[in-house]
Swiss-Prot record:
Domain of life: Bacteria
GO cellular component: cytoplasm
The entry's keywords: Aminoacyl-tRNA synthetase, ATP-binding, Cytoplasm, Ligase, Nucleotide-binding, Protein biosynthesis
Protein name per UniProt: Histidine--tRNA ligase
Enzyme Commission identifier(s): 6.1.1.21
Localization, UniProt: Cytoplasm
Length: 425
């Protein structure tokens, strides 16, 4: 017997019970994005490898260890996208969306990183991201954070996430800080692990977010990034904090927060949670004013964030037991008797014409009324429409609320209006 082919490790199937939750989560996220004036953009899953090397940075874990890279038949190096910002910027430059314009874009889809699979972290994962181009003040940074806070309230997880915030300054300020940090690390090189030694000269700021407790203890005496900020970055950060204070959004300034991608400057932030075990990041982003120019476009201020949907869904399921998944079926049509099935199908089509948003399923499995009602319950229907020979003859139907058992007989011509009222369509 041939061996069964299974999904690749770290790349998961999501079955109907899962996708009902995902669809409801995504619906909430998209509604909020729309309320802030964002438009969707869709980019390819595969991009030229140099895009990510130039954008993310060659001396990063993502580029060095985690990208799925291959040569096509023409010998061109291609990569499955590990994140969305670089592709969004590439598309904006290529199609003339960015220069001297304000753009608010969002995207959603699968990303790929070769990591050790664990809860909430997979080799194929899904992100939703938002990017704003053409605005350089701290107000838009604050509004993006305020928008994410609105997400948490809508999803019922606001009490289980907290905001960490930092400014990593301008490129020049970071260069000055980099020199001071390297000098400090050189004085304590015997304490550094191999990973930190490797990064000390190539990307020393990444030492700041080392998970090694000995390194974290050492960094208590290291130079503080905040002491090296340029005046403009300091003023920008103060403006951001002032706006968040005014909006009542709590935050903690974490001067070791630098983010893992090289393109950030000034504002960086993370929403974190400890409700899934060890503290994990739910949503992260920041400002990347130099990336558009770095990828060949005109200098354009930009700020954005991305969020992993797997971890978000896990968090919603863990802390919000009242969260309702997307309903697959609102109304289930039950029919019994000679010639009734055809009448039920035609009734269902008329109801779909009248109520395009209605989710309606007609029973095709036969069986007595008891079995058909059991199927309606299995599909999670809220309402059953019952047709028998008498109802067809009299152009009537029975409508039954499956939550409380109440039922009534009414004319078929009144069914659409009654369902619209009951389901608030």
């Amino acid at each position: 017997m041939a061996k069964n082919i299974q999904a690749i490790r770290g790349m998961n199937d999501y079955l109907p019970a899962d996708t009902a939750v995902w669809q409801r989560v995504e619906q909430i996220l998209k509604q909020v994005l729309s309320s802030y004036g964002f438009s969707e953009i869709r980019m390819p899953i595969v991009e030229q490898t140099p895009l990510f090397k130039r954008a993310i940075g060659e001396v990063t874990d993502v580029v060095e260890k985690e990208m799925y890279t291959f040569d096509d038949r023409n010998g061109e190096s291609l990569t499955l996208r590990p994140e969305g910002t670089a592709g969004c910027v590439r598309a904006g430059i290529e199609h003339g969306l960015l220069y001297n314009q304000e753009q608010r874009l969002w995207y959603i889809g699968p990303m790929f990183r070769y990591e050790r699979p664990q809860k909430g972290r997979y080799r194929q994962f899904h992100q939703i991201g938002a990017e704003v181009f053409g605005l350089q003040g701290p107000d838009i940074d604050a509004e993006l954070i305020m928008m994410t806070a609105r997400w948490w309230k809508a999803l019922g997880i606001a009490d289980h996430v907290s905001l960490e915030l930092n400014s990593i300054g301008s490129l020049e300020a970071r260069a000055n800080y980099r020199n001071a940090l390297v000098a400090f690390l050189e004085q304590h090189i015997e304490v550094l692990d191999e990973d930190c030694k490797r990064r000390m000269y190539s990307n020393p700021l990444r030492v700041l977010d080392s998970k090694n407790p000995d390194i974290q203890a050492l960094l208590n005496d290291a130079p503080a990034l905040g002491d090296y900020l340029d005046d403009e970055s300091r003023e920008h950060f103060a403006g951001l904090c002032h706006q968040l204070d005014a909006a009542g959004i709590a935050y903690r300034v974490n001067q070791r927060l630098v983010r893992g991608l090289d393109y950030y400057n000034r504002t960086v932030f993370e929403w974190v949670t400890d409700s899934l075990g060890a503290q994990g990041t739910v949503c992260a982003g920041g400002r990347y004013d130099g990336l558009v120019e770095q990828l060949g476009g005109r200098a354009t201020p930009a700020v954005g964030f991305a969020m992993g949907l797997e971890r978000l869904v896990l968090l919603v399921q863990a802390v919000n037991p009242e969260f309702e998944p997307m309903r697959v079926v609102d109304v289930y049509v039950i029919a019994s008797g000679d010639g009734v099935q055809s009448a039920a199908m035609l009734l269902a089509e008329r109801l779909r014409d009248a109520l395009p948003e209605l989710k309606l399923m007609t029973n095709f499995g036969g069986g007595n009324f008891k079995k058909q009602f059991a199927r309606a319950d299995k599909w999670g229907a809220r309402i059953a429409l019952v047709l028998g020979e008498d109802e067809v003859a009299n152009k009537q139907l029975v409508i039954k609320d499956l939550r409380n058992g109440e039922q009534q007989t009414l004319a078929q011509s009144d069914a659409a209006a009654t369902l619209a009222a009951l389901l608030q369509l």
